[in-house]
């Protein structure tokens, strides 16, 4: 969670740091952590390899959605077009291949708030990216997620919906989409 604030501070106060070490850090992040095409996974410096084997696609999806929403969206909103925006867009487009279908997430996360957190983060991201790009595919994807919660599912009848802590991301996401 500290990463975007280091980059934003350097962007505002130290262009040499921003264009030097922090840009290098972005390139190293991509080089070391990309595990499923461009999607990142947790890298262990002591092992000089990924932290977990075998691959846990649920963790990869969760981490990528977190990185986009908490790490890259704040940078994009202040800086605009940059290598960080390019990273955000490639991650988002790659995620679409893995989480466009809701049953996919359920196979990784049983009875946890992770599905709501991921979908909420995606709604927040997709709404903002739609405004940034004007590309209808991002709005359509967001609407599909929202329809799942507001039309396809009777939330009063489901066995488990956790809206506290991280699961509440869905509320913010639905709100942002409503304004979009």
Which functions belong to the PLM regions below?
Residues 1-180:
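Glycan-recognition and catalytic cores of secretory/periplasmic carbohydrate-active enzymes
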């Amino acid at each position: 969670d500290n990463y975007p604030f280091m980059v934003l501070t350097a962007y505002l106060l130290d262009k040499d740091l921003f264009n030097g070490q922090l840009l290098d850090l972005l390139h190293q992040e991509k080089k070391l952590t990309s595990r499923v095409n461009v999607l990142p996974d947790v890298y262990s410096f002591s092992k000089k390899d990924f932290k977990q084997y075998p691959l846990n696609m649920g963790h990869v999806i969760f981490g990528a959605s977190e990185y986009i929403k908490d790490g890259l969206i704040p940078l994009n909103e202040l800086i605009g077009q940059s290598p960080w925006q390019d990273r955000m867009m490639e991650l988002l487009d790659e995620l679409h291949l893995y989480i466009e279908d809701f049953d996919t997430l359920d196979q990784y996360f049983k009875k946890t708030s992770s599905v709501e957190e991921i979908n909420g983060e995606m709604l927040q991201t997709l709404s903002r990216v739609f405004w940034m790009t004007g590309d209808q595919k991002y709005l359509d994807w967001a609407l599909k997620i929202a329809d799942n919660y507001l039309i396809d599912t009777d939330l009063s009848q489901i066995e488990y919906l956790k809206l506290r802590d991280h699961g509440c991301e869905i509320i913010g996401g639905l709100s942002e989409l409503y304004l979009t």
